[in-house]
Amino acid sequence: PDRQPARSAAQRDAATRQKTKRTMHEDKIHFSKEASKELEVMSSAVQEIITKATNAFIENDVAAAQTIEPLEQVIDNLKAELRARHTKRLQAGECTIETGMLFFDIINSFERIADHCSNLAVCIIELSQGSYQTHRYLKSVKSQENARFMKSFEDYLRKYALH
């Protein structure tokens, strides 16, 4: 029963992505070269987090689940940076409002997918410890004093750096 809401949200995100792709194809809409490259970077990060979360769930692997939150934070950072960059392109007239809306839909969907993966990872970790204190766990893992989190976060920042 607990999995149904997450699955439904994930299905809604997938449907949103499919609708966006269909709209772009039907209306012959294309992103700028820069926007396409940025989406490729974020897409790669999202593909990695999906793979990590799926494997952690299937194997009930707490250690693997612990690698997910730093990547989720990098994806959050990517969303903010991509939003800012695309807004500048819109203001400069390099992109249309229509492509801007589609771009924002895609990065929002990517970020929500990463959030679902993070939620799954936290569940795996917390249930392995016999508790379910997600907010406390996330606060402690993201603290500056958590060297493992910070190292992973910095590694992912380098891996998914925008140029």
Model segments located where?
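Cytosolic, long alpha-helical scaffolding segments
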Residues: P1-H163
